């Protein structure tokens, strides 16, 4: 058994190239039919071209070199191991010390192969909107907006030949992929000022993606202002999200940190190939029932207080099957999950094959809080405040992991993301003439790490300080200089038992970042 990098000590890091170019063209025309009615038509065309080039070890070439048949000019039929153009690859340290077979540069170059991705996406959009007033209500004129949109979405990914062959040891490979679709949409919105205190807004939107994938979603919003200092708002509606082109038709191989239940406590990076469900199962659109209820209270010109309750109830959530959940289910006896796990002759994990799937449900709700107080001082205007989000419920049904209470957990072995139950910040803004100072203290509460089977480990809370000083140059109208930093005290993210050592879905590992910026507005 040999575990390590093929070209480790003595080898240089392979070159990696990332090249991305995005361009966008947009235009619109507006006009009026009369004093009450107007129109707007628009066009947009955008394109992103993305190239990645790297090197990785080619499996067959390495295996040949380990048996003495390495090198670009070696013929394994007529040659002999280690003779002439056929060379041995020495994986041991003796290849560097001179006490063993030396790995020549030509052999190393031959073992490595190019892994490239040449991808592009294109989006073309036409839309039109007509707006106007169609009557009068006690609170003012009733308004309406009616619109339509046509979108053409295209994507294409071209991988190198070796990548198409799954020839690489680490990044494995990927098949080429190309697809497109046309989407049509229409909407209508009504603004009804029922009284001077009550506004109602009714809206509906319909989208058609073809192949029977369509949805019509209504929304009702109400704003009630019984006094000048108090406002109550509420909304209910539904939402709809169709599978993306990639989720419906694409294939991608990524490397993920997984724990084999047959080898508890040992984590490793393994290739996970996600692709369309080849069983013929159609990926359904994701739908949600959405509700919000909140208020703002502003007694006077200084204090502002706001509280909002929000709720999202998702059905047919579009997910990538969690590879860790697949592994756990396969070992527990799930025959369908076991067919998606590839193991070697000795039982070692080789690859996990996952699909984009529809989870049964996800329900989450919580509260948003905000408070701010503004003071006019002899030294300038000072504004102090705080904001926080508290997650009350995060219940999900994972196709492999079952019913999960995900609030306050890392959710390593299911489709959800990490969900700390409390996040918030306090801030101070000071402004005087051309000078301004902003200070923010960010806090993320502790939560539980469920990454190891049968155990829950606490992930510590995390607090960072950001600050910025702004100077508006009087001699140059519209020019502002900014100096500041993120995480000024250089706080490290709380440790997590992963190869990276932290939870990349929640915390930023970069430490203290300082910057200077000049901005121009005109």
Model region roles, listed by residue range:
Residues 1-183, 211, 237-285, 306-365, ...:
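Surface-exposed, low-complexity loop segments enriched in small/polar and acidic residues
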Residues 23-27, 122-128, 184-190, 216-222, ...:
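Hydrophobic, lipid-facing positions within transmembrane beta-strands of outer-membrane proteins
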Residues 31, 132-136, 188, 192, ...:
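Residue-level signature of outer-membrane beta-barrel architecture
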Residues 32-38, 135-143, 194-198, 229, ...:
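Short loop/turn motifs that connect adjacent beta-strands in outer-membrane beta-barrel proteins
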Residues 41-47, 144-152, 186, 202-206, ...:
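Transmembrane beta-barrel strands of outer-membrane/channel proteins
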Residues 180, 207-216, 371:
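Solvent-exposed loop/turn segments connecting transmembrane beta-strands
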Residues 255, 380-474:
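C-terminal beta-barrel architecture of Gram-negative outer-membrane proteins
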Residues 304, 392-393, 441-449, 471-522:
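C-terminal beta-signal and adjacent terminal beta-strands/loops
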